[in-house]
Amino acid sequence: ALTDDLELDFAAVKSFLERHQGQRILLFGFTFMIWQHFYRALCQLEERLDLSNAVLIHGGGWKKLVSEAVSPDEFHRRLEEVCGLHDIHDYYGMVEQTGCVYMECPCGHLHASTYSDVITRRPTDFSVCDFGEPGIVQVVSMLPESYPGHSLLTEDEGVILGEDDCPCGRKGKYFKIRGRLPQAEIRGCSDTYAAKF
């Protein structure tokens, strides 16, 4: 959908949508790139696309591009305005724990999978937080076998909201990420992007 210069290739996108009209389409990308290079480009072109039959999975947050950040509700609302996209899901994950993502449910909560767990820890002594108590996020996965990525203490703050009782009906722990810890080094996909462009 983007050129090598990260410009929206509107003609290519429109052609793709015409070829796959009536079919379910999966869109995947980094949150900030979808916002900057897809949503904003459509607004500047004053064009609309029909993505009402698509699902968007996005992640990576805003990190260094905080000045561009919008709330999840606004992100959803604006994308629906320009392209009818309403099936939008965020995820939480990191390259250090490849293969393990925590998907957002229709209620806006992130969920641990069958193969993963999430724990929040108190910053003062690293003891486990109670449900509803913010803490440092630890992610656990049984997937990594070739490197020690099975248990990672992140630099993110989150809160576990509950277990087996999410209104969406999914079982397991569900949680929210509140942001980076104070004084945490900002790094990730948006850093690579910001450094390059």
Question: Where in this protein do the model-derived segments appear?
Answer:
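Active-site glycine/GP-rich loop and adjacent strand/helix microenvironment
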Residues: 1-197
